[in-house]
Amino acid sequence: MNLSPVLRLLYRGPRGAAPGVVNPYREAFPELDGPRAAQGRRENLEAYLERVEVPRLVLLGEALGFRGGRFSGIAFTSERQLAGPAERRLPWGGSPFRATSRNPALWLEPSGSIVWGALGGEARGALVWNVFPWHPYGARGPLSNRTPERGLVTANLHVLERLLAEIDGARVLAVGRTAQAALAALGVAAPALRHPAHGGAEVFRRQLRDWTAQPMRASSRSSTSPSLSASNLRAK
């Protein structure tokens, strides 16, 4: 499994005119981002992917949020979960992960806390991603979120398509209808879990538990399949 082509597309994108969209892996705002912020987010993402090893479960959300992946570099994950106080961090947080924002308190995303709580905080085998893997913001500015327009999602499905080709055999679950529709456009039928935001936490937890308890067809990936190792992650 080689995610280098996926990361190259991710770091380069998005395609087309995309006003109100930040690619946090190559862009930074001086008033919001700390030193070498974009590089730090790339490094955070690649370190996380190494911890995933071989994905067996993929949770696909909509887009990066400003309290989460916009500054952490990882979907459904906040700075505080990576680089905050030890009691607030995920079990796999700490070094080499780092915060990239100028927020002294570090950003914390409620949805990310719910998702990782439902996953038991375990990164191994669990890949979190977004169908639009950058940060679209609204009229209130860069510290806001918006749903990416359908045309914008469609124009950038090549990133998701390449990712899915590399992780064939994993169970794919959509978090919300936008993610489900994007998967359907690629010919992938996936159940839509209730998004944990806006009161959906309990339903999300129950649906995730129910779906992961169901047997799935044997993966085509053999026990010798390459994991997401450092050599397979470099975006050249």
Model-derived regions: residue spans:
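Short, flexible loop segments at boundaries between secondary-structure elements
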Residues: V188-R217
